Amino acid sequence: MSNMQQKTDVILIGAGIMSATLGSLLKELAPEWEIKVFEKLASAGEESSNEWNNAGTGHSALCELNYTSEKSDGSIDISKAVKVNEQFQLSRQFWAYLVKSKLIRNPQDFIMPLPHMSLVQGEKNVQFLKNRFEALSKNPLFQGMEFSDAPETLKKWLPLIMEGRTSNEPMAATKIDSGTDVNFGALTRMLFDYLKTKDVELNYKHSVENIKRTKNGLWEVKVHDMNSGKIEHHTAKFVFIGGGGGSLPLLQKTGIPESKHIGGFPVSGLFMVCKNQKVVEQHHAKVYGKAKVGAPPMSVPHLDTRYIDNKKALLFGPFAGFSPKFLKTGSNLDLIGSVKPNNVLTMLAAGVKEMGLTKYLIQQVMLSHEKRMEELREFIPNAKSEDWDIVVAGQRVQVIKDTDAGGKGTLQFGTEVVSAADGSIAALLGASPGASTAVHVMLEVLEKCFPSRMVEWEGKIKEMIPSYGISLTENPRLFQDLHTSTGRTLGLNEKETVHN
């Protein structure tokens, strides 16, 4: 056992896409800072960022219907869709900067062009999709989107989905070719490979046991070296907790006022994966449907082409599951251990409020393989049971907190940064849109935690991310220029791959 304190400038907890992004930004902005990373698992990007543990959608609201809500008068509120799209553009720009600067290579290993489509059935839903298409088409971020309710067009766009369909129920789809499939696991590993060349100390199989404030205002992180069994103590001026579902328990250990009255509810995801390559080759898009009435936002069904290890795959889901673990590799005591005197009422209030979610999860857990196949056949009528296996994806911990709008124990479905008033420590909580908006979220961490540095850093940030602080919606020419240039750098504008 070692009680020696080892000092550093920055500690990043968790080797996922968020820590990888923050570390990469900091190494460009403050190259002299010493950074240490602690990860419980044996390598980077193995939990939520792993390619099998998330949907791999470059979330930019091109096809996700839950980002566009219908108002009482039938008009469509696109504000959330615009926000998510603007945030994804920041990620695209930063990734393109890294590729252009040769800090990471071979972008086709982590991002591929792929049409994003929305698909609905029923007269009311067709009208909703048409209204959505018309509202989004007025915005430059969504240019190139097409709408069709003509069966012949749908057969061309969606051959696998339309084959064997006997229902006369009206159907419609939108299609936009500027969508992407992102392998966040591969990207995370690339970023940590780059950070290693910049002398960032990567410590795998190191579990953070405690975080506490020292008398001189630093943060002391107690770390268990799982290789040697030793306990280490590291201190830093700034700590980022980017441990996915494991972030909430660590945030609670800090004791900062901002960590109080926050709870977490874990939801696990399952996907069906097609093992018949002939079927896989018949589909080429991410196709998002509409969540069923009463189902939570994370239940939106989608049929996705994926590129994993440079091989085409086909996944359908998600189906929800329940586990009290906050991480896929976590403990069954995670949920009960997160209940504290300061959040127990918040958690209980959520339990009463969210009976619909509880009922939904119970129904999902009880589904047999054949019942899941029935849901899949709503997308692929001719789907055969023997062609599909189930894979368990990652855990997502939905944030529960008290809000002015929702009252006590309100379930949050977004991604949220919680930081100390003095900016010395920050944690990332929540789920979707998550990894797609990593650059936006980590810029938010910089703004909250290093406000005195932002004027000094602004020039470099704008070199890396040209639309930082600018609305692309209000600057369509800039959007077009950046979309074209980042697309060229990332190999998204043409079919051939980019090697550099």
Curated annotation (Swiss-Prot):
Family: Belongs to the MQO family.
Cystines in this chain: none
Associated pathway: Carbohydrate metabolism; tricarboxylic acid cycle; oxaloacetate from (S)-malate (quinone route): step 1/1
SUPFAM superfamilies (alphabetical): FAD/NAD(P)-binding domain (SSF51905)
Molecular-function GO terms, alphabetical: 2-hydroxyglutarate dehydrogenase activity; L-malate dehydrogenase (quinone) activity
InterPro entries recorded: FAD/NAD-bd_sf, MQO
Xref: HAMAP family: MQO (MF_00212)
Pfam families: Mqo (PF06039)
Protein name as it appears in the record: Probable malate:quinone oxidoreductase
Source organism (scientific name): Bacillus cereus (strain ATCC 10987 / NRS 248)
GO-annotated biological processes: tricarboxylic acid cycle
